[in-house]
Amino acid sequence: MEPILSAGRANGGADLVKDTDINGFMTDVIEASRQVPVIVDFWAPWCGPCRQLGPALERAVRDAGGAVRMVKINIDENPEIAQQMRIQSIPAVFAFRNGRPVDGFVGAIPE
């Protein structure tokens, strides 16, 4: 996997941090990653490390000023995507670029 640009979020009304589901995955992740890298956060509401990591990722996205977008996927509500991506532990974070995953990690990591 090749390295990805640091996380970022632009202002101006664009949906740069958003939730998606099986119906929006192709547009929100695959197609969007052809324009700008997309960080995908696989999480669940009962996951303590997910609740810690999510806000830290969102801050990093905002701080990078539009370099990337972030999409959050609740694995309890979207088991099909989790299965397709072979998610076995959460939090699991993948960076997509040009329509494919290029980097990722599993578990909460310190800022």
Where are these regions (language model features)?
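Proteins that catalyze or organize thiol-disulfide redox chemistry
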Residues: 1-66, 79-80, 84-86, 90-92, ...
